[in-house]
Amino acid sequence: MAYADAPRRTDGDPDGNPSVAAVTDVTEVSGRTGALHRIVIVGGGAGGLELATRLGDKLGKRNKAHVTLIEKARTHFWKPHLHEIAAGSMDIGVYETNYLAQSHWHYFRYRVGEMVDLDREQQRVTVAPFVDEDGDQVTPQRQFPYDTLVMAVGSLTNDFGTPGAKEYAISLETAAEAERFHRRLVNAYIRAHAQAESLRPEQLQVAIIGAGATGVELAAELHNTTRTLVSYGLDRIDPEKDMRLILIEAADRILPALPPRLSDAATKLLSKLNVSVRTSARVAEVLPDGVRLASGEVIPAELVVWAAGVKAPDFLKDLGGLETNRINQLVVLPTLQTTRDENIFAIGDCAACPWLGKEGAQVPPRAQSAHQQASHMVKQIRNRLRHQPLAPWRYRDFGSLVSLGEYSVVGNLMGGLGGRNLWIEGWFARMMYLSLYKMHELALHGFWKVTLDTAARVITRRTEPHVKLH
């Protein structure tokens, strides 16, 4: 590899040397005798950050291992809440976690950057130079040696190469994209209110491609927030007449990966909210001002959101000769080790993990599976340090919950009374839905900080607009 002969630092500086093209981030001087085990985690999503936090608390704090988290973003945000950022019903500044501060509080190292290469023989990860918003280089290309590598880079939406998708549709993969959609939505309403002429038919129409959990939750959330937005003085707009939401799904029902009863309940509620649901409708092209279906029908839209399909990042398919599947996920064993390297693990959406007990099935890419895998990885790494056998991970499916804005939450809990599925909705379902995020917060911050932050949010919420206006 081109970087194999990069100079090796021996002065203990963890940030590398900007005077060379590629530097090695070294946590100990040359010679491995008695050196601490080096754990490198790539990706600071739900699973990656929970793992780094827990390993830092258990190993880094006691100086039993060096724990490093590599992530290109500066702050962490729980991805299942992105639809609320897009709708404007949640302020990201209140809910995001700063990686640098988190690493300081929990005894791991955060290094900003994006992984671009892997040398399995030398056990080194290469991270590209980090460039800021102004195009200025902040850090050079660097290399990070590891003894245990955990890939937790998450997933992206999959546009399946659909023409126009990248150019004209907004995908909700990051908080920045969700905020971009929200700004465009607010601007569209202000523009419509201020224009001299009457609103054009379907001027404020939003097309959401993909009726999985993200698409369905976004549609329900937008129904409420757009009406709240109009109530703030944009009275030329009639939300019932001028604003339309269209949900487009290629499968024969919405929420196709979830139980039919949940899909039926969500369909009925969306109908009450005047959301137009188009199933068995495949998108052939995204246009500057709408969507063309495979049937030839054109659906006009001022804004198009792509929320269909899931794949792991493209760089994984050529990464160090590791085995991947057709959507770029790293294929792993029940121990969460990759099939071709026992020192490399993968968790979360980027891992194709067998579902033990379900022949031929894979664990679905959900927040609950990433949370469970992070907890299991803590045990696996501690076993590695003790030279003990690794245990297979068994996924526990606790069910599915879908939030339909302020109107309802519907879902099913697995293993209910008598070992059967338990259908839930209403207030109890909403409490269960909120508890999913609270579990993530507790894993990152602990009980007292979560309790105080929650109380502060409740107080602040009473003095702020219910919809973000910028």
For every predicted segment, state its role.
Residues 2-4, 23, 34, 379-470:
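C-terminal, flexible cofactor-proximal segment of oxidoreductases
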Residues 47, 154-157, 219, 310-312, ...:
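Short glycine-rich anion-binding loops that position phosphate/pyrophosphate groups of nucleotides
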Residues 15, 64, 106, 110-129, ...:
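A Rossmann-like FAD-binding core segment of flavoenzymes
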Residues 67, 366-385, 401:
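An active-site-proximal "capping" alpha-helix that borders the catalytic cofactor pocket
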Residues 21-27, 167-196, 289-292, 298-303, ...:
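FAD-site-proximal beta/loop scaffold in flavoenzymes
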Residues 2-8, 16, 20-117, 213-258, ...:
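Beta1-alpha1 glycine-rich phosphate/pyrophosphate-binding loop at the start
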Residues 2-16, 20-36, 108-207, 305:
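FAD-binding core/adjacent interface of flavoenzyme oxidoreductases
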